[in-house]
Amino acid sequence: MVKKVIRFIVLIIGLSLVAYSGYHLFKIYSDYNTSDKTYEKLQDEYAVDDSKKDDDSTKGSEAQSPWYDDIDIDFAGLRSENPDVVGWIYFENEDISYPVMYSGDNSYYLRKTFKREHATAGSIFLEGSNKTDFSDCHTIIYGHNMKNLSMFGKLKYYNRDENYYDSHQY
């Protein structure tokens, strides 16, 4: 009888731990998903890839395209939503395309999105002691190395795989 009670208690504790862990995993997944959707929406609304524009001036011409793609950002629109935007970081080969935030406080955007909502992913942001016009000798931009490969998550592959650089040069 005592063994049955102990087994039942262990079972309840085990199920409670599984439920608790599942809840937290769901919360993390949901947070990642919300952040991804927020930044995808920003990119769709405010970033225009020049290589995808239908420009009449280049139709029929033999002009060579540059080795990179330009991207036009509607900074006025972005700043109307959040005046802390100071730039946009874009690496086409790494799917890195995010607004760069600045508050002067290195911890403010660590866990806040562009919309100033709490999120594990936070934002990509400029070092608090840097100038917002990027005129410093060295400008430091912070961002998370996310497990779902968002933000700066894909940059780790440059260190892990020597061939990755060859196929993902900017």
PLM features per residue range, with description:
Residues 1-17:
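N-terminal Sec-pathway targeting helices
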Residues 18-170:
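Solvent-exposed, non-transmembrane regions of membrane-associated and secreted proteins
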